């Protein structure tokens, strides 16, 4: 799996998920750093718009869609819940879409 493949797909689906209240911010972690191995998961940073309903179900659907497309484990991090340390680490890796 190549970084470009992931970024292109995230850009493609971003408008669809924004209509559902999810803002796909970008890719971080080993794929963003070009250090991924076969065992690496894909790390995606999102935020959720205020007044979005059914957040858990929609987030689960997003994760399921991404894992089906990429055939890899996907971790979805929500900016709102990141610790200051995690935010600091991610800011250096994050590739915005």
Spans of features found by a protein language model:
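Catalytic core of pol beta-like nucleotidyltransferases
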Residues: 1-24, 32-38, 49-97
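Conserved histidines in hydrophobic membrane contexts and catalytic metal-binding motifs
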Residues: 27
């Amino acid at each position: 799996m190549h970084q470009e493949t992931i970024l292109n797909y995230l850009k493609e689906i971003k408008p669809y998920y924004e209509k559902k209240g999810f803002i796909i911010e970008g890719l971080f972690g080993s794929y963003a750093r070009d250090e991924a191995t076969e065992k690496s998961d894909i790390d995606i940073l999102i935020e959720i718009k205020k007044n979005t309903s059914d957040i858990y179900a929609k987030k689960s659907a997003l994760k399921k869609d991404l894992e089906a497309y990429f055939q890899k484990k996907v971790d979805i991090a929500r900016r709102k819940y990141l610790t200051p340390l995690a935010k600091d680490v991610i800011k250096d890796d994050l590739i915005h879409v």
